[in-house]
């Protein structure tokens, strides 16, 4: 009988990616198969997030429920990974004796050895070190699960925003070598993946080593990935404004595979609050990036993160944020009430904004952005949109579900053979969380590929001066 593995994942898309790699790793290691039922599992893994308030308490509440399972099944192995594990380390074991494994985001590749040690009688294994990109060298080959895939290209962040725990829980920025990234994406493309989302805590800070000991910039990487046969749609998340350089913007001008949608967190529209957050830029600099982006790609839509009620946020500061939202006309946002994260500089600032005021401001902000998003959706009615068909519709399995470049779900009537492919649909109706489309044409009627090699694309923009320094010039 096969061994069963249950993974509960909280947090960002990077955690989702890590959890999928854990599952692949343990399947290859000893044939563990995933189960949604924790009660039938032989190994329980909790992949945690420390961004939100009371993250630690949430972990211990879950472990309390799992302890009941272990009392009934003494051989059950329980592991805690992710950012809370990295932050708390052995304190987790001291408070929850049922835990066998504690591992950080950078050491998940050591899970097989950790499990072996527990089976050999060791009481607990704790490894929350930061061995840079070693984990990627030890993970099994990628497995596609549908036409879209996430690929991690870097780990950590070196920006040290005053409110953020990422540099402390995932380490500083470390980029994967270019060849490793390209190989993983090419393997996914061979399995039918058509859309790739490049992941990183600060993805546009990517600086990956090449085979000849040069450095590949993020803009170059985008061009390389866009040239991989079979990859016809390209996304990335999450970016930082101070790393959003002109060469990245230039890619939007001539690379149709790169979608007309960008998530670029700003957090606040107040220069005073941005300074307190140690974001490294002002609101006008953010607006300048968006202005240049829209010049390169006029139809691009922008989403952002916002923190509401940061210590010292006055009514004027919030008004500045709302003014920025009006100026940019964001399509979507991930917005949260500020909660202090232990160990961060902002945790020492006086939190002088009342909870009621925070809630009111959050509601105002979310209502405004929802209105803007609905306006964009209505503007799509009557247009023809290219969507990647992901599978049957959630509400009506007799229909199909696809996603537009700007991440809107479209339900339409179509043939099963379209799943995993691109189709063009006319948008005919708008709902709160989806659009309605009518099938226009299939992939066999489209011209999706350009007859270019990766080197042809990058050579157009790359040149070296007399000193051998690589330069990029706009198209």
From Swiss-Prot:
GO terms for molecular function: 4 iron, 4 sulfur cluster binding; metal ion binding; N6-isopentenyladenosine methylthiotransferase activity. Residues 143-375 form the Radical SAM core domain. Residues 3-120 form the MTTase N-terminal domain. It catalyses: N(6)-dimethylallyladenosine(37) in tRNA + (sulfur carrier)-SH + AH2 + 2 S-adenosyl-L-methionine = 2-methylsulfanyl-N(6)-dimethylallyladenosine(37) in tRNA + (sulfur carrier)-H + 5'-deoxyadenosine + L-methionine + A + S-adenosyl-L-homocysteine + 2 H(+). Its main location: cytoplasm. CDD domains: Radical_SAM (cd01335). It is found in: Cytoplasm. Belongs to the methylthiotransferase family. MiaB subfamily. PANTHER family: CDK5 REGULATORY SUBUNIT-ASSOCIATED PROTEIN 1, MITOCHONDRIAL TRNA METHYLTHIOTRANSFERASE CDK5RAP1. Catalyzes the methylthiolation of N6-(dimethylallyl)adenosine (i(6)A), leading to the formation of 2-methylthio-N6-(dimethylallyl)adenosine (ms(2)i(6)A) at position 37 in tRNAs that read codons beginning with uridine. This is tRNA-2-methylthio-N(6)-dimethylallyladenosine synthase. It comes from Shewanella pealeana (strain ATCC 700345 / ANG-SQ1).
């Amino acid at each position: 009988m096969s061994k069963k593995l249950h993974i509960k994942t909280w947090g960002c898309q990077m955690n989702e990616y890590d959890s999928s790699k854990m599952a692949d790793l343990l399947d290859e290691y000893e044939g563990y198969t995933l189960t949604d039922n924790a009660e039938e599992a032989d190994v329980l893994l909790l992949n945690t997030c420390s961004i939100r308030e009371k993250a630690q308490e949430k972990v211990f509440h879950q472990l309390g429920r799992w302890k009941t399972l272990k009392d009934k099944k003494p051989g059950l192995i329980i592991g805690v990974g992710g950012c809370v594990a990295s932050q708390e380390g052995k304190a987790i074991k001291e408070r929850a004796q049922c835990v066998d494994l504690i591992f950080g985001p950078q050491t998940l590749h050591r899970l097989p050895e950790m499990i072996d040690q527990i089976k050999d009688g060791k009481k607990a294994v704790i490894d929350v070190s930061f061995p840079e990109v070693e984990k990627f060298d030890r993970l099994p080959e990628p497995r596609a699960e549908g036409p879209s895939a996430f690929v991690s290209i870097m780990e950590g962040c070196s920006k040290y925003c005053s409110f953020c725990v990422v540099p402390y829980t995932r380490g500083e920025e470390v980029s994967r070598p270019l060849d490793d990234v390209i190989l993983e994406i090419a393997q996914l493309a061979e399995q039918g993946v058509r859309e790739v989302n490049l992941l990183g805590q600060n993805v546009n800070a990517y600086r990956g080593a090449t085979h000849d000991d040069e450095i590949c910039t993020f803009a170059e990487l985008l061009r390389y990935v866009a040239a991989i046969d079979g990859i016809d749609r390209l996304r990335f998340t999450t970016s930082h404004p101070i790393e959003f350089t002109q060469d990245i913007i230039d890619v939007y001008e001539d690379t149709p595979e790169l979608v007309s949608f960008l998530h670029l967190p700003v957090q606040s529209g107040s220069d005073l609050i941005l300074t307190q957050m140690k974001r490294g830029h002002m609101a006008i600099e953010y607006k300048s990036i968006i202005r240049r982006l829209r010049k390169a790609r006029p139809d691009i839509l922008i989403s952002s993160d916002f923190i509401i009620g940061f210590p010292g946020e006055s009514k004027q500061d919030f008004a500045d944020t709302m003014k920025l939202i009006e100026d940019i006309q964001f399509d979507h946002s991930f917005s949260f009430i500020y909660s202090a994260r232990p160990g961060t500089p902002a945790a020492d600032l006086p939190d002088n904004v009342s909870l009621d005021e925070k809630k009111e401001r959050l509601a105002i902000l979310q209502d405004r952005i929802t209105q803007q998003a609905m306006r964009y959706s209505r503007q799509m009615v009557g247009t023809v949109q290219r969507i990647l068909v992901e599978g049957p519709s959630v509400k009506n399995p007799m229909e199909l579900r696809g996603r537009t470049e700007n991440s809107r779900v479209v339900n339409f009537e179509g043939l099963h053979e379209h799943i995993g492919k691109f189709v063009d649909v006319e948008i005919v109706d708008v709902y709160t969380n989806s659009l309605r489309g009518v099938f226009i044409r299939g992939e066999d009627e489209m011209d999706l590929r350009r007859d270019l090699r990766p080197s042809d694309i990058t050579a157009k923009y790359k040149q070296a001066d007399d000193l051998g320094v690589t330069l990029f010039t706009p198209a």
